């Protein structure tokens, strides 16, 4: 049997063809030190070290410096002639620029003689020597030259027209009084600083006006929004918050849809807190520290309803009720309801204080009185009924310069039955007293406290006896009263 052998050749199906990499140019083969410059095409050295290869079609540049007389060490291509001059790339460029400048200098402008030759055709000959034919031929020649000169001119294009500012003030008559160096374009450092300062001030004023305009527009739009919102709330009523009781199926569906629209794009949880903090920071950055106490919740109102009408008072911070309806909040901590009395209950909110049972001002119980006033001493009736003529006034008790302060010994303070002892001040030592005991009493030291104590004991024990015996030794001397007049004492 003949066997058939089938050789399957490998295919490139499913294999990624390798991308041919571009060969990097080889570096220069300079032996004295490593050079990273690429080689010239077909050579082993770069353009800087190509002179190391003697067989390379390069030679040293032919430029010789006029300052130091040295020759340029750069390489230049060999010329076709053996003794030809060849320059490197840099000196060849400089040589071309010099030739171009020299050609401009050698090409002068139009000279006066050439201009006169061009205008000689317009010169008029003498009238006597001219014939009609010559004059006619001269006129036709002038017309031909004019038509030829007109035909030589090319039509003017848009690019060839004058490009100037139509509102330019260069030719204005009103600007003659300005600075002639305004359009010079050259300024000193002080002038540049002054001009830039004026421009910045003008720009700042324009920016401030623009910001004020934007603030006005923002306030106007906010006012319109609040007005439309109020009109909408008055038209819809409080049915959005009280519930769908008493509504038709279609109205309930519309109410549900409206609530969904109101909750759309509303932030909750952490996002709401972060958004509020962002607003507060923006307000502090724009309005300053004066607006720090004003928060975004200042426009929120109380959620309580009185007779199906929502309360218009502002809610307390961090709450949803005002001060009047704070008791409706089940999560309150800083307020309690007043207990009132058993007969008349009271539900007014009262802030929690140090007391355990806070009360409103109407039901507040006063604490017991800590201070007790002293008891007034009872005055006997016989003292109250005493004659008032026996008391001296304050004016009578004041001493004068001419008369000394003296008291009467018969002055009855308590009553007729009790008289005070005589005062030692009543004795005048200047008087000539014939009675030696009285004189000794007036001149000698007197124990006032001892006499008053003895007189008091005598008044308690003897009663009216002392009142009869005490003034006896003083009967012979004159006694001055409170009025300063001496009166004789009488013994009853």
Curated annotation (Swiss-Prot):
Pfam family, one: zf-C3Hc3H
Tissue: Ubiquitously expressed.
Compartments (UniProt record): Nucleus; Mitochondrion
A biological-process GO annotation: chromatin organization
Post-translational modification Phosphothreonine, affected residues: 131
GO cellular component terms attached to this protein's record: histone acetyltransferase complex; mitochondrion; NSL complex; nucleus
Annotated crosslink Glycyl lysine isopeptide (Lys-Gly) (interchain with G-Cter in SUMO2) location: 78
Highest taxon of source: Eukaryota
Start-end of Basic and acidic residues biased regions: 135-144, 162-182
UniProt region (Disordered), positions on chain: 126-182, 453-492
Phosphoserine: modified positions: 147, 149, 168, 172
Disulfide partners: none
Region annotation (Required for interaction with other NSL complex members) ranges: 308-364
Entry keyword Ubl conjugation: yes
Key words of the record: Chromatin regulator, Isopeptide bond, Mitochondrion, Nucleus, Phosphoprotein, Ubl conjugation
Subunit and interaction comment: Component of the NSL complex at least composed of KAT8/MOF, KANSL1, KANSL2, KANSL3, MCRS1, PHF20, OGT1/OGT, WDR5 and HCFC1.
Function: Non-catalytic component of the NSL histone acetyltransferase complex, a multiprotein complex that mediates histone H4 acetylation at 'Lys-5'- and 'Lys-8' (H4K5ac and H4K8ac) at transcription start sites and promotes transcription initiation. Required for NSL complex stability and for transcription of intraciliary transport genes in both ciliated and non-ciliated cells by regulating histone H4 acetylation at 'Lys-5'- and 'Lys-12' (H4K5ac and H4K12ac). This is necessary for cilium assembly in ciliated cells and for organization of the microtubule cytoskeleton in non-ciliated cells.
Protein name per UniProt: KAT8 regulatory NSL complex subunit 2
